């Protein structure tokens, strides 16, 4: 910069010359505003092998017959996951006692009936809960479930209550059969019995066999809480075992969390599942499941027959032919089977076939003896039907009673032993009879018994006393409740504690959408729900016991103070609390939250013109500076730009650690940091900050313009050269003689003009450097040469005149201009070098000759030569005089010669 000023001052502004200027442009980089949140999804693997919890009893009878073949309509999966299932056994032991008056000895058949059950996680003492003996739950547990937890809180929808009712408003979900995808579907016989004749595996319904429905599944991420999908079972296939399927059928993951709650409709043989808030908390949900199933006895009625077992899971259909055998022995005068176990009260619904062979008896007394069970005479469910068609003894022990004759009122049923024994005289006054009967009765669990329970039948005839026994073993892990036990409710309220005092005030309102999970004393999940629009939740149908309730924390809320005050009904019990039910509802389990305060940070980016690192009142903000905010993990959670006043800010921040990053504008340098009070200094390009329950508007940064260097070099060189040469020559001659006149004029004009201009400019700098070098070189050379030569000759004689004129003009003009400019600094360098060199050379040469001749006599020879010479400014008088005298002598000689010729002529 200084060099340029010096050159300009020396030469000034030269007209008609190139004058250059360097203009530096200041710019500030800009960036677009980007404020957003990244959702980070973590990975969570849920793997375990678990099947549907089934607490079942299957009647087992030893049937000697062979089995038909098994045909499948679709290919079976080769590898099957099977869970170990504990068995409960029903032992049917017909005891044939030989009468005193007969020599015929009948053999005793002892078919062993075994039920297979899937234990749940809850272990109930078999002696304390007799109702556990026969139940087989249908709550399906998924195997190898995997899901990715969602890190963002999604506001849940209120769920339809299934197993447990709550006060939450029911959610009308959408059927998403097309979004739940099933594969590797299979219906397998668990255990099974191989027919020794055919080699085929058969399903023996009364001998410990069950069917297992298996499949893998995936759930689309678009599925939400409240959405539904269905399992549709075919004509010969249903969920459950000998125990009827529960109306409630839940789908669990491997950890026991409920993914979906199912409601079974026996009328349509369909289970409708409703997704819980689990699908709102996790993505990429997939897994597999096993579900205990059974032949639908009222339709699949005949032994050794293959029935097509069909199921449609979502939109995926599957079918397989299964050979069914119930073990009915048509030659046996007394045989019984557990038709089904009621899922609600666990009562045994028994069917007894009497006198299938149609024997004739004179004595026929039927006695039922219960152990662990009792009859309820008031229920009037002890029925006696007379058989009119042998085909009414269906193998499945599920006769169509509408086609039978109800003759119960014709017989006297005598109850004894505290309603644990019932006796009927089937002769009813007749002397003999071959009538056939189907007897149905219901046995209710007796909680006072410590025995696992059994039901014994005897038919005392005049020929033989026949016996048949149905026994049941307990199933460990069954969570089946006592059918006679009273049910209670548990729950209450989740509210917003606006004043943060931990107490429910009248003006404070409930919070909708909080997830609530109910667990038993062993930590097993029993149910889950979501608070309704009033913050209410409730679990119903619970027995006496200890439960735990877990509350989720909605995004933007913080749990309030726990157990404030002395009134448990209006305080907050925290995120996890324990509730005890003892012969009454417990509606005191509440949880309070207050909105988590949000904070802001930011402030100012300014131009520190005096470079002192302090914000002065005269210094202004810089617009368009990009500012990035990171959380403690280094994740970008927001970006912005300073406004026209240099201000910026980030809002809605939780207490925590953050980092603010300023992006340096182009062409500016960071000013000094931490030079004064925190709200007036510069904090640097990256600033760590911790917010603890307050805003922070002290995060500033300053910049100043980078230093620049200008170097200008001007060089002007002017060279003027003028050379003039004039030459005049006049010659007059009069003569009568011959005259020769030679005039030579030489004019040489040489003009050399050299102009050299060198301009070097070197500059190193981190700032901006402008170097202008102008060099003007003007060289003018004028060379004029004039030569005039006049020669007049009058003579009668001969005259020779020679005139030589030489004029030389040399002009040399050299102009050298060297300009060196060196500038070293931390700057950028721009160097412009202009060199102008003008060289003008004018050479004029004029030669003039004037020779007027006036002959006085004949001229023999006349030569006139003239050569223009440059005008030199001098006269050649000697040459003129010589010419004059030469002319005189020539004229005199001519006269003398002329006189002699005249004399001779005379």
UniProtKB/Swiss-Prot annotation:
It comes from the Bacteria. Residues 51-127, 669-881 are annotated as: Disordered. It is found in: Secreted, Cell wall. PROSITE patterns: GRAM_POS_ANCHORING. Residues 1-50 form the signal peptide. It is a peptidoglycan-anchor. One of its GO terms (biological process) is cell adhesion. The modification Pentaglycyl murein peptidoglycan amidated threonine is found at residue 872. Residues 487-597, 598-708 form the CNA-B domain. Disulfide bonds: none annotated. Residues 873-906 form a propeptide. Residues 56-71, 80-119 have a biased composition (Polar residues). Its main location: secreted. A motif (LPXTG sorting signal) lies at residues 869-873. Homodimerizes; via N2-Domain. Interacts with host NRXN1; this interaction mediates bacterial attachment to host cells. Belongs to the serine-aspartate repeat-containing protein (SDr) family. This is Serine-aspartate repeat-containing protein C. It comes from Staphylococcus aureus (strain MRSA252). The lineage of its organism: Bacteria, Bacillati, Bacillota, Bacilli, Bacillales.
